[in-house]
Amino acid sequence: MEVFWARGYEGASMSELTAAMGINSPSLYAAFGSKEALFLEATDFYSHTEGADIWLALEEAPTARQAIEQFLSLTARAYAQSDRPQGCLITLGALHQDSSRGAICDDLRRRRAENHTALQKRLERGVAEGELPADFDASAAATFFATVQHGMSIQARDGASHNALLATVAGAMAAWRTLAGGSAA
């Protein structure tokens, strides 16, 4: 998983993958069938193991504002860990459908859409609980905060520090009042 996370689908060579797994190419093909299938397994594993605290905080925070702030702050911490590849495998794993396999791009696109839906549902809960105005555009706000998270992934990959990512979080949260129609809640 970490080879794909660090290098992306296209950048990960078979020799790097087999070395990381401690097996030879025939064993990899026997176990997974293809590099594509291995990547899909790796992204599934990543989705279930990395960043679980980010998505748990989104659900458990008492207010939508706190949920988004924790979501972004925990993202900043996760993306800047020095002992792991920086950024997000789901965001950076394969961005070019013309060079990556269609199934891989489709899978990553689906996962990003699921993340957007989780953000949107949490914001809709804020509307239902009266924290946010009835005309609050939860989909647009979810798109904004997902885009911030994706941008933080790119910045982390480019070497941004945890503090630099937290500055991005502060900037994104400064937009909360505008997005929430003047509500600081």
Model-found features: residue ranges?
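Helix-turn-helix
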Residues: V3-A37, E41
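Hydrophobic packing within well-folded, soluble alpha/beta domains
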Residues: V3-F4, L17, L28, L38, ...
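Hydrophobic alpha-helical connector segments
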Residues: E41, W55-Q86, A138-F145
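Short, basic, alpha-helical segments at the C-terminal edge of helix-turn-helix-like DNA-binding modules
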Residues: D44-E50
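Amphipathic alpha-helical packing segments from all-alpha helical-bundle domains
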Residues: G51, Q66, G102-E129, A140-T143, ...
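Amphipathic alpha-helical segments used for helix-helix packing
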Residues: A67-I68, Q81-A103
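Amphipathic C-terminal alpha-helical segment
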Residues: A78-Q81, R125, F145-H162, A175-A184
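Hydrophobic alpha-helical segments that form the core
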Residues: Q86, T91, F136-Q155, T168-A175
